[in-house]
Amino acid sequence: MSYKKLYQLTAIFSLPLTILLVSLSSLRIVGEGNSYVDVFLSFIIFLGFIELIHGIRKILVWSGWKNGS
């Protein structure tokens, strides 16, 4: 898997993982009764997933993983 593919997977899977985690933690993104805290927490989780995957990519590149061109 190339660096470019991993970057694309980051974009594809970050939002679904965020929605899944927020749903499992009993927060509601869609529906009645949303508070600004719920939306804020879901946004923080979303950013966390993006940073986690970016960090994994940096470690892979640092360890000598090639771009796969």
UniProtKB/Swiss-Prot annotation:
Keyword Protein transport: no
GO cellular component, one term: plasma membrane
Any one GO BP annotation for this protein: bacteriocin immunity
Sorted UniProt keywords: Bacteriocin immunity, Cell membrane, Membrane, Transmembrane, Transmembrane helix
Stretches of the chain found on the membrane's Cytoplasmic side: 1-6, 62-69
Extent of the signal sequence: none
Domain of life: Bacteria
TM helices/strands, residue ranges: 7-29, 39-61
Periplasmic compartment spans: 30-38
Coiled-coil segments: none
Entry's localization field: Cell membrane
Cell membrane recorded as keyword: yes
Membrane topology: Multi-pass membrane protein
Primary location: membrane
Function per UniProt: Protects a microcin H47-producer cell against microcin H47.
Record protein name field: Microcin H47 immunity protein MchI
Organism encoding this protein: Escherichia coli
High-level lineage: Bacteria, Pseudomonadati, Pseudomonadota, Gammaproteobacteria, Enterobacterales
Gene that produces this protein: mchI
